């Protein structure tokens, strides 16, 4: 049950601290839609998505009106399409991608994920064909999101697919160059990808998730920052306790939305993702929380320490507020989506190397990083390999969403607008990892994988 006091606190957090729910995401299984005939699969898929998500926009609007709580995005996550299209030609795959995008537009769904593949071990020809279709799929759509999982702690790392993905990302950038290579913002590479992630671009409906489920992603960095503004001289343990209490309140709001959305749509409740997700708005920034904790500028020494503390406190507070938690659950540090992170880059305090260190203690990884358009494909692959290694050897989810902005050089600005924000093109290490990446093969799982 939710008390009147909790609802009043939620309303106050909305008014004073930019609290919102980042997304209600409906996960939908497409296994019963599969067919060797592409058009039949598309028709079946369309009926299934309309059945479960046809009323998503209206229900989200109802919840906004009922609680005065903004819901930023309405999203859908599908069974990984690569699992259902083994026999399809390249052209058939693009028809499926276009059909998914058209359904999303028709239902006014902001983003739809699941044009995805998992390639932990062998990189077979069917999967290679599917991954090769991603650049054209993203270039010809507006709302479709795509992801590839290249390793797990139990399976190791697939360097063959990582080597290919450097070229895929360059190709996406080239094919969406008229929009500052925006297609790359809808593609992410994962290690240990969760099956119930409500956030894009990496959301898909995992094979064990049932016919459908609702997952909710919270936001609320502004709430935490505002609470810390009253703790200027507090000890670090008091800071930790304050963050934990605020995370509890934010997550209760997410649980409230999850409960009502489940009832209104008649879809089982999935999880609340305990992630603080920033927006480009001033005062809604993870970087500003870290600076409120005591950093002069995010990216300076102490940033990894402060972020680790924030991440752990958010999880502990959130876990008390919702029984079913999952997804990515932590603090997000997407550069272009966080006005404070952008300022850190512009000031020269926040580098790619420091971001990589910070990703070892928080949710996801190198996210919404804009790099020069002439970066070599092997350098992108090596960025991915570094980040995936952090995930595999620390048994956590990590990811890379990098934008090699076509025609842009270091220091230029790219503006995606909306939630994706803007960023300066960051400097990169120009030494070549080509010989390492071209070795290919599989990296065995680490010894911590032997847990039975």
From Swiss-Prot:
Official protein name in the record: UPF0210 protein Csac_1314
Source taxon at top rank: Bacteria
Complexes and interactors: Homodimer.
SUPFAM superfamilies: PFL-like glycyl radical enzymes
One Pfam family here: DUF711
Family per similarity comment: Belongs to the UPF0210 family.
Range of residues in the leader sequence: none
NCBIfam families per UniProt: PRK05313.1
């Amino acid at each position: 049950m939710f008390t009147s006091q909790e609802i009043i606190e939620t309303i106050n957090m909305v008014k004073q601290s930019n609290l919102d729910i980042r997304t209600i995401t409906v996960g939908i299984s497409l296994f019963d839609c599969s067919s060797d005939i592409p058009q039949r699969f598309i028709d079946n898929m369309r009926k299934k998505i309309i059945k479960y998500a046809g009323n998503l926009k209206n229900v989200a609007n109802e919840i906004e009106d009922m609680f005065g709580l903004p819901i930023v995005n309405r999203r859908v996550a599908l069974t990984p399409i690569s699992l259902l299209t083994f026999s399809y030609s390249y052209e058939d795959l693009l028809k499926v991608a276009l059909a998914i995008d058209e359904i999303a537009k028709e239902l006014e769904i902001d983003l739809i994920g699941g044009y995805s593949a998992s390639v932990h071990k062998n990189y077979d020809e069917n999967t290679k064909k599917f991954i090769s279709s991603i650049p054209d799929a993203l270039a010809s759509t507006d709302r479709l999101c795509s992801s590839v999982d290249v390793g797990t702690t139990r399976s190791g790392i697939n360097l063959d697919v990582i080597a290919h993905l450097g070229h895929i990302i360059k190709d996406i950038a080239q094919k969406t160059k008229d929009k500052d290579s925006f297609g790359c913002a809808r593609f992410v590479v994962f290690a240990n990808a969760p099956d119930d992630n409500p956030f894009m671009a990496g959301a898909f409906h995992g094979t064990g998730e049932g016919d459908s489920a609702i997952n909710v992603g919270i936001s609320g960095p502004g709430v935490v920052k505002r609470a810390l503004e009253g703790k200027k001289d507090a000890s670090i343990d008091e800071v930790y306790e304050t963050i934990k209490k605020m995370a509890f309140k934010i997550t209760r709001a997410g649980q409230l939305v999850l409960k009502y959305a489940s009832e209104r749509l008649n879809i089982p409740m999935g999880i609340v993702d305990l992630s603080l997700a920033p927006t480009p708005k001033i005062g809604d920034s993870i970087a500003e929380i870290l600076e409120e904790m005591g950093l002069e500028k995010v990216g300076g020494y102490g940033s990894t320490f402060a972020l680790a503390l924030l991440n752990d406190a958010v999880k502990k507070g959130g876990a008390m507020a919702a029984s079913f938690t999952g997804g990515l659950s932590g603090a997000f540090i997407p550069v272009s989506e966080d006005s404070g992170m952008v300022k850190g880059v512009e000031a020269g305090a926040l580098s790619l190397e420091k971001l990589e260190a910070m990703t070892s203690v928080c949710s996801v990884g190198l996210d919404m990083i804009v790099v020069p358009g002439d970066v070599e494909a092997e350098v992108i692959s090596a960025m991915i390999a570094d980040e995936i290694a952090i995930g595999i050897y620390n048994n956590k989810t990590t990811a890379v969403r990098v934008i090699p902005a076509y025609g842009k050089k270091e220091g230029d600005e790219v503006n995606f607008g909306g939630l994706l924000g803007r960023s300066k093109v960051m400097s990169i290490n120009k030494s070549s990892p080509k010989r390492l990446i071209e070795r290919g093969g599989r990296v065995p799982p680490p010894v911590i994988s032997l847990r039975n």
